[in-house]
Amino acid sequence: METDRKWIIVRIDGKIAAASTDYRLLASISSYLAEQGRRQEKKIRPGKPGNTKGCIFSKITAEAIGMDELWELRHKTGWEDLMLFGTDFQKKVWHKLWELTHAYVRTTDEDNAGSDTRDGHGYQKPEDLTLVSYSDFAELCQNRAGVRAVAHAIGLNPVAVIIPCHLVVPKESIDKIREINKKAEATIFKGDDLCISSILNDSSIDFGEYSCGRELKRELIIRELTGSWS
């Protein structure tokens, strides 16, 4: 399965800056930080090369982990645990993506009155987790007229899975799923996870582009909606 591959987690001073299936984002971030350091150096000591103390970050690390570890990390990660590099618009889109699986819900637990809970880590996963079309997601971002700009920002998401860009798919895919599901309503498998998994595995359903590959996007969607891998 595509999910058997290793994931590279990049951290800067302990905060997650990237999650990907290769080292390209590590190289990109390292290059960006080096450039920022050079600019900072010029501000501190203009015209005096050799100063390397301008970098505003002290440590960048990368580790390879498995899919299950990444899934667990996703449930432990708060928005404040991320360090994202991008425009304000991109960060707005990424935050809205993050909210698809990390929505804040007020608890009714008397022992934790007024606090926010989710899987024991300060947030709660929404019960009605589902796929979202690009146009509907653009509306969530209050930018329905700018679907292409929103889609472009989604494609640049540096922290795959933790920021679940795989949940945004073409509207045609959602319509196709509903059509197949409607036919399944009449069967004894109605609502069964096996039936849902079979529908999501249907090769006629195209879930769209994904930076880590189309097949992996399908497997991540199946995990999200059924709780198990394909």
What are these regions (language model features)?
Residues 161-170:
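Short Lys/Arg-enriched helix C-cap and helix-to-coil transition segments
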Residues 145-160:
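Regulatory, non-catalytic segments
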Residues 152, 166, 218-219:
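Extracytoplasmic/periplasmic beta-strand context in beta-sandwich domains
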Residues 175-179, 208:
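Glycine-rich, flexible loop motifs
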Residues 1-144, 182-200, 204, 215-230:
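Basic nucleic-acid-binding alpha-helical/helix-turn surface characteristic of O6-alkylguanine DNA
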Residues 208-214:
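Catalytic-site neighborhood detector that most strongly recognizes the C-terminal catalytic loop/helix
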